[in-house]
């Protein structure tokens, strides 16, 4: 089957975005189901194959489900490509929401944080690290739900690594990855790596800016600030005792040992401070 034949299986199809070797479409099949169709240029890309494997293993309401996947021929260049058909999420990315000038109040921040921790608990049960939690990969659904997407950097703990041990840097998104990730310290990467990223993401939700990124910063400058800069403490209406701000600082701790040991611990700590927060219903 080639790409044109694959597209013919849908009654309507429109391109949403293209980046690198991946093109994403919104499509409707003959049963009226709306799906996301992804076509990736390299059919042997190990990270994409790993992402497919991980997503097929997971069955969580807050992660888009894979409906089908396989290999298809790109007739333009006569080479194989991968395709993924997955659940389509109506909504807006957290990145686009922030780019519209929005900032999260204490209630919205708590909801996003609480949902991400529930997802992280399930990932931890399955020995999976996402490793790329940031506003680009969080969808605020039109139905009020919050979704975590893009498992392209995800890692199954215990599996062989796709990055050479001798490599100076591991795969990461600057400004969100902690030191143990971008420095490619493989044995140190665990759930606390994801918790750091969650902390930075929530901080950015509340302030509108990533504390480690300024315009025109190089990746090296961002990494240096991630290791050395202590972000200004959050000041949020509804956090009179500063417990939420302290909690976010704990997630963003430079020293891994100062972050919660597990996602469950992180959720337990969050629930323990909930009574100090003035949350809207």
Provide a role label for each language-model segment.
Residues 45-57:
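AlphaC helix of the eukaryotic protein kinase fold
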Residues 65-82:
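Short beta-strand micro-motifs within the conserved protein kinase catalytic domain, predominantly
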Residues 77-93:
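Conserved short submotifs of the Hanks-type protein kinase catalytic core
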Residues 112-113:
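Activation segment signature within eukaryotic-like protein kinase domains
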Residues 120, 124-140:
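Catalytic-loop of the protein kinase fold
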Residues 165-181:
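Conserved activation segment of eukaryotic-like protein kinases, specifically the C-terminal portion
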């Amino acid at each position: 089957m080639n790409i044109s034949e694959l597209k013919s299986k849908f009654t309507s199809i429109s391109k949403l975005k293209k980046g690198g070797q991946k093109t994403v479409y919104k499509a409707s099949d003959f049963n009226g189901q709306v799906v996301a169709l992804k076509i990736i240029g390299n059919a042997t890309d190990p990270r994409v194959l790993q992402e497919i494997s991980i997503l097929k293993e997971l069955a969580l309401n807050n992660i888009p489900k894979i409906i089908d996947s396989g290999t298809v021929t790109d007739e333009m260049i006569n080479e194989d490509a991968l395709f993924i058909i997955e659940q389509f999420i109506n909504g807006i990315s957290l990145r686009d929401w922030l780019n519209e000038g929005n900032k999260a109040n204490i209630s919205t921040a708590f909801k996003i944080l609480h949902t991400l921790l529930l997802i992280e608990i399930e990932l931890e049960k399955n020995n999976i690290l996402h490793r790329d939690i940031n506003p680009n990969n969080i969808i605020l659904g039109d139905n009020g739900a919050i979704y975590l997407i893009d498992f392209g950097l995800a890692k199954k703990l215990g599996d062989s690594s796709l990055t050479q041990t001798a490599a100076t840097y591991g795969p990461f998104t600057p400004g969100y990855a902690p030191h143990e990730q971008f420095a490619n310290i493989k044995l140190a990467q665990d759930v606390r790596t994801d918790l750091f990223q969650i902390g930075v993401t929530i901080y950015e939700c509340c302030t509108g800016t990533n504390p480690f990124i300024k315009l025109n910063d190089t990746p090296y400058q961002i990494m240096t600030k991630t290791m050395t800069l202590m972000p200004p403490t959050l000041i949020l209406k509804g956090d009179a005792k500063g417990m939420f701000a302290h909690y976010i600082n704990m997630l963003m701790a430079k020293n891994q040992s100062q972050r919660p040991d597990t996602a469950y611990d992180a959720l337990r700590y969050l629930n323990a401070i909930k009574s100090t927060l003035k949350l809207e219903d």
